[in-house]
Amino acid sequence: MKFSPAHYLLPLLPALVLSTRQDYEELEKQLKEVFKERSTILRQLTKTSRELDGIKVSLQSLKNDEHSAKIDVQKLLELGQKQREEMKSLQEALQNQLKETSEKAEKHQATINFLKTEVERKSKMIRDLQNENKSLKNKLLSGNKLCGIHAEESKKIQAQLKELRYGKKDLLFKAQQLTDLEQKLAVAKNELEKAALDRESQMKAMKETVQLCLTSVFRDQPPPALSLITSNPTQMLLPPRNSASKLPDAAAKSKPQQSASGNNESSQVESTKEGSPSTTACDSQDEGRTCSIKHKESPPSNATAETKPIPQKLQMPPCSECEVKKAPEKPLTSFEGMAAREEKIL
């Protein structure tokens, strides 16, 4: 019997089957793995295709972007050129400005130096002015003190001027009184002259009456009385002569007494007026009283003159009161001029 190779292979079949089964299982596993890998690859491919699509889109966008970028680059280049040109112009302008600023800075530096010198000079001037102000303040203080002293002096001077004004008024009033007195004295002088003429006629009449009385007495007396009279004829005859001689002496004495009394009265009036200026500033009523007093004082002098007959003519002495009263008129005018000047100064 002939054995074929297949008979030889039959016992090996189970092993082959097992091996094949194992191989199939392994293959199935491998196939599964391959399918898995294929699915993963497909998935990856889809992803990659998608990514490729995105890349294509991005490439197109990039192309578009590149084109726009090129346009932008060109624009930027143009702008860069323009900016370069502008920068050049700006640089030139800046250089010019720098030159100008440098020149200005030099000028400012010069002005600053000049101002510094002026500030130093002015500071010195300010110091000098401060020192002058201090000296002026001291002078002002001294001047204020002097002003106070001058103010006090001016007050005193004003008080003196007021007193002088009142004194001027008193002096004017005294001058008026003196003029009135001069007029009154002139009137009294005229009256005295008239009275002297009347007294001469009265004295003549008195002499005649005395002689008549004596003759009548001597005629009416008895003879024994005549013996007595004849024993002392000088005593009987002397009285008329003595009386006649005494009468001129008494009249002469009465005249200087009257003039002296008038001078004393005028001096007393003036002294009272000068000693008490308040009393001299009287009213017109006081003037009337003084006039009435003087008129009352004058008649007794006339009466005494009439009681004492004067055979000779009465020679009136020069009016000393008039001379005394006329003399103060000149100082009055000078005093009025001084008062007017003081009023102008005020």
Curated annotation (Swiss-Prot):
Residues 164-192 are annotated as: Leucine-zipper. It comes from Pongo abelii. PANTHER family: LEUCINE ZIPPER PROTEIN 2 (PTHR22414:SF0). Residues 1-19 form the signal peptide. GO terms for cellular component: extracellular region. Residues 250-261 have a biased composition (Low complexity). This is Leucine zipper protein 2. Keywords: Coiled coil, Glycoprotein, Secreted, Signal. The gene is LUZP2. Residues 225-346 are annotated as: Disordered.
